[in-house]
């Protein structure tokens, strides 16, 4: 049985110039870093190394491009190296101690807020942007940058279902994010990024600001999502990375309340049944319910008490 692969930063954090990926000038050094032979590298450069399928578990179906085992190992290795490079404070995704909730909390307050995301972010980050990152930002030789960009992309773009997707999408688009950050900071506007979700809050967040953000994004060959871009007025509630943000605190979304209480009612109806099948089903519902309640407990402490009572429940 294969051991599960995971990103390992070894608790390291350093500048881009101190990365093991910096200034790789020969194929031999690249092969050594990735622990690959010439033949293995050659076999991994085709798009046939991905399992491609449709994920229908969400409201909107998503095309998933997941690397097969050998390529997944290489992606995990490169992702581990990329995740050791320090990222700006405005990034809240893929960083220990940060989350969608720290991203949302940053914007608590009455100020006008702009929420948006980049349409089809991974698919719209093309191989030439990945090549530019390895060649210009990491100062690799052109042939090494070409190999790395081919290893890290599927059908000419960043894959949608790899461990490398999130960190590489940031670095390949760092110029765009940094330009947006500079533009915001000059106007005393707070900006945060969670993968492809970008949020701005401040007194100078206006329609003109929104239009200029749109221009910057388009300048870097991306599209501001037309239906997911909202300009929130002063003192209004806004949904930021899954949490409702008010003037003084985070709140739980109504749909999350409804989902929790629907499953809680279902669990309470069947929790005392004794058949084997019902016990398995009850445990599944209980675990799913606890997962949802624990998640919302990060926003509202009252849910932590509810989770404890469910976890400690014993049949009469």
Where do the protein language model's features map onto the residues?
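Catalytic palm active-site di-aspartate
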Residues: 115-119, 161, 165, 186-202
């Amino acid at each position: 049985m294969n051991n599960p692969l995971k990103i390992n930063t070894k608790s390291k954090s350093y500048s881009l110039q101190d990365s093991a990926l910096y200034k790789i000038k020969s194929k031999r050094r690249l092969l050594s870093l990735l622990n690959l032979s010439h033949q293995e590298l050659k076999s991994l450069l085709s798009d046939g190394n991905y399992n491609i399928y449709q994920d229908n578990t969400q409201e909107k179906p998503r095309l998933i491009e997941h690397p097969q085992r050998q390529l997944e190992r290489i992606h995990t290795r490169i992702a581990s190296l990329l995740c050791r490079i320090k990222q700006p404070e405005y990034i809240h995704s893929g960083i220990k101690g940060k989350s969608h909730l720290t991203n949302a909390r940053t914007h608590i307050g009455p100020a006008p807020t702009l929420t948006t995301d980049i349409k089809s972010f991974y698919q719209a980050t093309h191989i030439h942007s990945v090549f530019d990152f390895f060649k210009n930002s990491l100062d690799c030789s052109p042939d090494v940058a070409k190999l790395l960009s081919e290893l890290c992309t599927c059908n000419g773009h960043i894959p949608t279902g790899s461990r490398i997707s999130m960190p590489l999408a940031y670095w390949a688009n760092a110029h765009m994010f940094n330009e947006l950050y500079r533009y915001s900071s000059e106007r005393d506007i707070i900006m945060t990024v969670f993968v492809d979700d970008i949020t701005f809050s401040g007194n100078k967040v206006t329609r003109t600001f929104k239009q200029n953000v749109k221009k910057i994004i388009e300048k870097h060959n991306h599209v501001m999502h037309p239906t997911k871009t909202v300009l929130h007025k002063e003192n209004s509630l806004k949904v930021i990375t899954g949490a409702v943000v008010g003037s003084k605190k985070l709140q739980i979304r109504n749909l999350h309340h409804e989902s929790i209480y629907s499953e809680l009612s279902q669990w309470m109806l069947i929790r005392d049944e004794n058949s084997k099948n019902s016990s398995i089903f009850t445990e599944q519902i209980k675990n799913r319910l606890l997962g949802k309640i624990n998640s919302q407990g990060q926003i509202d402490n009252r849910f932590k008490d509810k989770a404890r009572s469910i976890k400690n429940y014993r049949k009469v």
